[in-house]
Amino acid sequence: MNQKSTLLLTGCVLSLLTACSSEAENPACSLEHSVDEVHRVMDAWHRAASVADSSAYFGAMASDESIFIGTDETERWTTSEFKTWSRRYFQRASAWTFVPVTGERHVQTQGDVAWLDEKLDSEHMGRCRGTGILTFDHEANSWKIAHYTLSYAVPNEVADSVLQVIERWNDSK
């Protein structure tokens, strides 16, 4: 190996070693810690909705421009729009309740970005799925939800009949 290659390799190794020199400075540096923190953020977010804590619920969003996509094709909201739409729900004892199915949330991280999919149970909507993207907020030293999509989990065996119901609904409008 020539001197130039050795210097380049040494520089790369040093960069990697110092990039995440302290987990305390940046918890996103520890993969295991990051995954655990994402789980905690998501659990707290779902819990906040179930007790109608709008401050905690919307405080978990990365910004007023973060996106929430609901189950209806018209439901694509920024955080600001979603706050306005859901205000009446957060005035109740519980806005809505989605309970993550144990062992059915899968989280991946890469640097300051995390993505997940999860299965959720709900009394009013049955089994659902959620997918999300979180970003690490260095100022808040925590993960924040940048994008979340909620969808019904429709068994393939009943998909044709569900599609027929949707077609009839669309035709009636």
Regions inferred by a protein language model and the residue ranges of each:
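Bacterial N-terminal signal peptides
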Residues: 9-17
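Surface-exposed, charged secondary-structure patches
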Residues: 81-127
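Short beta-strand edge/turn micro-motifs at domain boundaries
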Residues: 127-162
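Bacterial N-terminal signal peptides that target proteins for export
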Residues: 1-8
